[in-house]
């Protein structure tokens, strides 16, 4: 990429990044130190910690582990970031990924409890866009120990794990406290607008969005904005 860049009229720095796992069964077999020499930053996929594949209902994007209810937190973001840092990755190169969707569990008495089925969703079974949450009849709750949010409908015995504005704000403060490089999401079309926007909440805490100039050069594109290099 650097060699190619040197042949261009304007030599760009092309960024090389990776979407990296937050589960130890995956990150422990990676040559993180070797990869870090070439990567500009690491996008940590800090979500999908729990889901339809599990035996009990759990948090899908918690910051910390729950000692009192370990079944609810099979993974946690704090431990994942700690591992990458110990492998030599600078905190500023780690970008915290956050979900703009929730994972559902049906017929369950709560976190760490068995469930049966995940039900329907916004675009696949058991997965709801954040903008559709909380579901009618559900109340939003916060897990102090795991540092995670979710909603629960006791009448339907239906639980959905997802980030709320409170959780987004807490994660943004955690990013600042630990000197991380920023935040990213999967994916923006599922966000709410206004004060309930998770992206907007995080940006409000961090201060701004990424504003690096685009390095797209495609003068023959049929799209005017591409021909102009996405200059706005």
Model-based region annotation:
Residues 80-87, 135-143, 224-231:
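Noncatalytic linker/hinge segments flanking ATPase motor cores
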Residues 103, 157, 163-232:
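Acidic/aromatic/glycine-rich contiguous surface patches that form carbohydrate-binding/processing clefts
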Residues 1-133:
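Substrate-binding surface in catalytic domains of secreted glycosidases
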């Amino acid at each position: 990429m650097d060699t190619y860049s040197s042949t261009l009229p304007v030599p760009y720095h092309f960024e090389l990044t990776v979407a990296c796992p937050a589960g130890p069964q995956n990150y422990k077999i990676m040559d993180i130190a070797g990869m870090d020499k070439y990567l500009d930053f690491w996008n940590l996929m800090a979500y999908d910690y729990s889901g339809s594949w599990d035996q009990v209902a759990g948090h899908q994007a918690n910051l910390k582990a729950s000692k009192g209810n370990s079944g609810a937190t099979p993974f946690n973001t704090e431990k994942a970031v700690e591992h990458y840092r110990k492998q030599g990755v600078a905190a500023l190169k780690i970008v915290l990924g956050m979900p703009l969707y929730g994972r559902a569990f049906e017929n369950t008495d709560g976190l760490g409890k068995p469930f049966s089925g995940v039900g329907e969703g916004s675009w696949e079974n058991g997965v709801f866009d954040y903008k559709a949450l909380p579901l009618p009849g559900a109340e939003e709750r916060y897990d102090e120990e795991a540092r995670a949010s979710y909603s629960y409908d006791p009448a339907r015995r239906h639980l959905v794990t997802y980030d709320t504005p409170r959780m987004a704000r807490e994660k943004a403060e955690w990013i600042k406290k630990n000197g991380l490089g920023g935040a990213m999401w999967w994916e923006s079309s599922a966000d709410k607008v206004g004060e309930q926007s998770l992206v907007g909440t995080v940006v409000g805490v961090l201060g701004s969005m990424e504003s690096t100039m685009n390095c797209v050069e495609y003068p023959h594109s049929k799209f005017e904005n591409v021909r102009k290099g996405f200059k706005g």
